[in-house]
């Protein structure tokens, strides 16, 4: 939303198309380019009605050539949803990495004991702070909301553990396992 707001009154606003390709890695810069990165990925387009039809056609042709799926969304919805599925993932990864680095002062212990689960969970902690700090700043309101919910879920899990309520822990994890079908559905669309 802040980007759309920033260009709202620009005299050439109709020559701007607000897009957010949902694709990337933890690396940044030209050396991190990956051929085919956008193939099968979603590209969110906001406020398409404010862009000239000719530019829309050109952009859609380019996105189609890249193999992207298009999803139209208003900027507020984009910011809300992206805070859950992207921003929170990055924060979780950064903070898990911080927790382990602060606790495990011996790097060899981390190296020897960390398996693929840990590696995949902290992969995003390798992301560029120069890129992510402004993202968190721009979407602060939504990021704070998602963090509050996430922290409440972590606190609830901790409480269940403290109270030896392993049935509830099992049930929580079983309910969250539904994410598997969602992710499998995403992968099937690619």
What are these regions (language model features)?
Residues 1-31:
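Rossmann-like NAD(P)(H) cofactor-binding subdomain of soluble oxidoreductases
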Residues 4, 53-57, 147:
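Conserved strand-to-helix beginnings and helix N-cap segments that scaffold or border functional pockets
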Residues 26, 51-52, 143:
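Alpha-helix N-cap/loop-to-helix initiation residues
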Residues 32-37, 134:
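Short, flexible, solvent-exposed loop/turn segments with mixed acidic/basic and small polar residues
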Residues 35-123:
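Internal alpha-helical scaffold of NAD(P)-dependent oxidoreductase catalytic cores
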Residues 107-176:
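Interdomain hinge/lid region at the active-site interface
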Residues 181-190:
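Long, positively charged, glycine-interspersed low-complexity recognition regions
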């Amino acid at each position: 939303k802040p980007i759309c707001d920033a260009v709202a009154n620009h005299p050439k606003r109709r020559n701007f198309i607000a897009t957010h390709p949902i694709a990337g890695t933890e690396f940044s810069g030209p050396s991190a380019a990956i051929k085919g990165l956008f193939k099968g990925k979603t590209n969110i387009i906001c406020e398409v009605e404010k862009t000239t039809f000719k530019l829309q056609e050109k952009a859609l042709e380019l996105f189609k050539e890249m193999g992207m799926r298009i999803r139209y969304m208003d900027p507020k919805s984009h910011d809300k949803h992206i805070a859950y599925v992207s921003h929170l993932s990055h924060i979780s990864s950064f903070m898990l990495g911080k927790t382990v680095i602060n606790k495990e002062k011996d790097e060899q212990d981390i190296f020897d004991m960390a398996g693929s689960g840990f590696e995949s969970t902290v992969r995003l902690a390798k992301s560029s702070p120069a890129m992510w700090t402004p993202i968190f700043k721009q979407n602060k309101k939504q990021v704070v909301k998602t963090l509050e919910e996430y922290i409440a879920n972590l606190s609830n899990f901790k409480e269940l553990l403290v109270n030896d309520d392993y049935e509830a822990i099992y049930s929580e994890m079983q309910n969250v396992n539904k994410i598997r079908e969602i992710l499998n559905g995403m992968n099937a669309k690619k």
